[in-house]
């Protein structure tokens, strides 16, 4: 399957003050546990350690649907929502490229 055919999300979440570490660990553990993603990046804003950015690329449309309708997704969603200071921003995308940069 070509990368451009794989569904993905770009997600921004802001944890309640001081809960950034807990949010990061929960998101990382959940993504590892689900097995629905082929690759993901979790990043923390330099200026605000309670803001998480996540780029998640699913293995396929079906893997995304299966995860979103799973008990694990429901469980994680409830736990994550309880840690957030505001609703998350979630943008559905399809990757264009994910290539190593050849630095000479």
Model-derived features: positions:
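An amphipathic, aromatic/His-enriched active-site/gating alpha helix that lines ligand/cofactor pockets
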Residues: 29-39, 57-92
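Non-catalytic surface loops within mature trypsin-like serine protease
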Residues: 15-17, 59-60, 94-97
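Short phosphate-engaging motifs
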Residues: 19, 50, 63
């Amino acid at each position: 399957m070509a990368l451009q055919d794989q569904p993905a999300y770009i997600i921004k979440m802001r944890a309640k003050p001081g809960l950034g570490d807990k949010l990061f660990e929960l998101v990382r553990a959940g993504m590892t546990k689900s097995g629905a993603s082929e690759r993901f990046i979790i990043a923390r804003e330099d200026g605000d350690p309670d803001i998480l950015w996540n780029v998640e690329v699913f293995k396929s449309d079906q893997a995304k649907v299966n995860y979103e309708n799973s008990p694990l997704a429901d469980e994680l969603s409830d736990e994550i929502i309880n840690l957030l200071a505001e609703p998350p921003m979630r943008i559905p995308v399809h990757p264009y490229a994910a290539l190593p940069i050849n630095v000479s």
